[in-house]
A protein has these predicted regions:
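Short coil/turn segments at beta-strand junctions that form active-site/ligand-binding loops
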Residues: 1-2, 79-82, 109
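Mixed-charge interfacial surface used for oligomerization/domain docking
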Residues: 3-4, 10-31, 35, 91, ...
Length: 179
């Protein structure tokens, strides 16, 4: 069965890996003041941080259900029968919910959605490893979710921030938490 993988850009899949493997990365919407961008498509990380340093207020939004559904439908038209979708943590974003809603709107393709419960490059590395193992035949489809859980327990991500200003400006902290 032809299988494809999907994730959102917050999971930071290596661009070279993305271009050479059966994975589609759906960009997160990035808003800086009144301008809207697609993460890593219409704005680079360097440009994003430059604009924040210059005082623009950032916020992000999960990919729209319609955009996710379009990806699922395009993969189905390419003959894909199974899709594994990795979502940034449902505790941090509505992306998981959007993946589920899109799944409910399409028939004829099996979709497994995995809530990574994390964010950042370490998740991307785990996904890349899973795809390599699956593509070489060493990882059966039925074991993908368990393999992700196994890999995710092999690392911890510690995040430090220079200032909490951007977390507040992006809506991740309330005013009381910020002060």
């Amino acid at each position: 069965m032809k299988t494809a993988f999907v994730c959102d850009s917050a999971l930071q899949i290596n661009k070279n890996f993305e271009n050479n493997n059966p994975i589609t990365v759906i960009p997160v919407e990035v808003r800086l003041d009144d301008e809207i961008f697609e993460d890593n498509v219409t704005i680079t990380p360097d440009e994003f941080y430059k604009r924040i340093h210059n005082g623009q207020k950032p916020s992000t939004s999960q990919p729209a259900v319609g955009k996710i559904l379009s990806v699922y439908e395009e993969l189905k038209q390419q003959g894909v029968e199974r899709i594994v979708a990795f979502s940034v943590s449902s505790k941090l974003s509505g992306t998981y919910s959007s993946f589920v809603q899109a799944k409910e709107l399409i028939d004829g393709v099996e979709i497994k959605i995995i809530d990574t419960l994390q964010i950042a490059r370490m998740v991307g590395i785990a996904i890349e490893k899973i795809i390599k193992e699956f593509e070489t035949g060493s990882l059966p489809f039925e074991n993908i979710e368990n393999r992700y859980l196994e890999l995710s327990q092999q690392h911890n991500v510690l995040v430090t921030v220079e200032t909490m200003q951007y977390l507040y400006a992006g809506g991740r902290l309330t005013k009381a938490q910020f002060v």
